[in-house]
Amino acid sequence: LKEVLNHWMGEGYAYTTVKKVYIVLNEYFRYLTQQEILTKNPMNSVPMIKKSNFMAAQNKEDLPTQETVTVFTPEEIEKFKAEAFSKFSNGKSKYQQPAAYLLMLNTGLRTGELLGLLNSDINLEGRYLEVRQNVKEVCRREGTDYVPGREVKVGKTKTATSKRRVPLNEAAAQAVRELRQERDFGPTAPLVSDEKGDYTRPVNFRKRYYRILKAAGIEQKGLHSLRHPNVKPKTHIFYI
């Protein structure tokens, strides 16, 4: 039964949907035990996974409702930028690929879309990039069975309309240049790659972002806050 719930979680079903399945199964087996068809309710040994863990397993953020509409103020953007590009006393950057967050801010890309960008998807001369794919983390599987651990999966964009051409302003173009200067594994490699030239794990990208927020003294905001100005037409866009 636990494998059934994990299956639906791994397939990307919403937490509320899986929880409803859990409740229905629990009620069903409770009825069977009351009718003495079963001696024990098997659901008693199958606890419902915590929402925070469930969301993390699906590469989603379990954030309070108010945070979903929180945007950066101009002052917060300056603080974020200062911390993101700060260096240690020896001159080494504190954070990897800080320009990636500026690229999100100036293009409205989703996290998975940004991490799925290949260098070949970007045309600096034409000042645009092509969103073609999406990166997410999923539970590992061996055949039809789930095994411990998670892996990066590259696939289609969230929706059909998500596959699009995005214009680049000067701030976004400069962010691309800085990312390539820091790490460039060629045209077929991800723009925001890990040290080996592979796709960056979304969880690592998020953790780095939250470390910057904390160090800069900015209240916690989801990564979607960086793209919020670009998906809400009436919201002022603060270019960095």
What is the predicted function of each stretch?
Residues 34, 99-113, 204, 208-211, ...:
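C-terminal catalytic core of tyrosine-transesterase DNA break-rejoin enzymes
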Residues 1-42, 89-93, 199-203, 219-222:
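N-terminal core-binding DNA-recognition domain of tyrosine site-specific recombinases/integrases
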Residues 77-78, 137, 161, 167-219:
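Active-site/catalytic core of tyrosine-dependent DNA strand-transfer enzymes
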Residues 19, 38, 44-111, 115-117, ...:
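Basic, Lys/Arg- and aromatic-enriched nucleic-acid-binding interface segment
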Residues 33-44, 137-141, 178-186:
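Proline-centered turn/helix-capping motifs that create local helix->coil transitions or kinks
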Residues 1-6, 49-51, 231:
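Short, conserved phosphate-binding/catalytic loop or strand-edge motifs used
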Residues 48-51, 117-178:
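Conserved tyrosine-mediated DNA breakage-rejoining catalytic core shared by Y-recombinases
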Residues 87-94, 153-163, 193-200, 217-225:
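Short, contiguous acidic/charged loop-to-helix segments that flank catalytic cores in large enzymes
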